[in-house]
Amino acid sequence: MHKFTVALDCDEVLNNLIEKTLELYNARHSTKLTLDSFTDYDFYKCLSFEEAEDLTAMFLEKELWDSLSPAPHSQWGVKTLIDKGYDVYVATATHHTNFPWKVDWIIKNFPLIDEKHIICIHNKSLLRADVLVDDCAENLISTSPLVDRICFDKPWNRNVYDDAYHIYRAHNWEEIVEQIDTCYKDSI
C-alpha cells in the first residue's frame, strides 16, 4: 500500500531562518529590518544591493545555524504527522556549503526525521510527494497540480492567489497538519 508522502521545506517552515538572520543582521548593522520588509522572495527586489548581499551571505554562516530554533509548533507538527503514519521528508533548496550544517540542525531538532529523508533539491517540481509544504510561491506553482500544495503564509508569498493555483494557505502548524489530513482523506 502507498504511504502518503509529505515533503516539508526547511527554511521558514521548520524554522524561522529569516527572522533569526534579521536579528543578527540588525545587531551587526544597527538597522531595524523586519520580516514585513520582505515583500518578495528575491531579497534583491526589496532591499538595497548591499543589504541583500550581506543578508544572503549570512545564510552560509555556521553561527546562524547554531543559534537557530525550530519554528513554533513545528516539532509537534512533524511528530504528529509521523505518528499518523505519513512518510515525512525534508526537501530543501540550499547552498551546498551550508548543507551539512542544515542536516545537523534538522537531525538535532527533528530526531524523528530519518537522515535518509533529508533531500537537497533546487527544482522541487521533481519531487514525487503527495503534499508539498513550502513558503516559496515559485516552488509551489511549478509543482504538478496533482500534488497537493500548502503555502506557509509569509509576507513574500501573499501575492499568490491560492484559488488561481489551487494552493492551500496555512498560517501555522496546526493548519498545516489539518490540511494534510484533509488532503489524505481526499486521496482515498
Where are these regions (language model features)?
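Metal-dependent phosphoesterase signature
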Residues: 33, 39-79
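Structural recognition of alpha->loop->beta junctions
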Residues: 105-121, 163-182
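Substrate-recognition element of Asp-dependent hydrolases with the DxDx(T/V) motif
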Residues: 63-69, 74-106
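Short, well-ordered alpha-helix to beta-strand connector turns
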Residues: 85, 115, 129-130, 146-147, ...
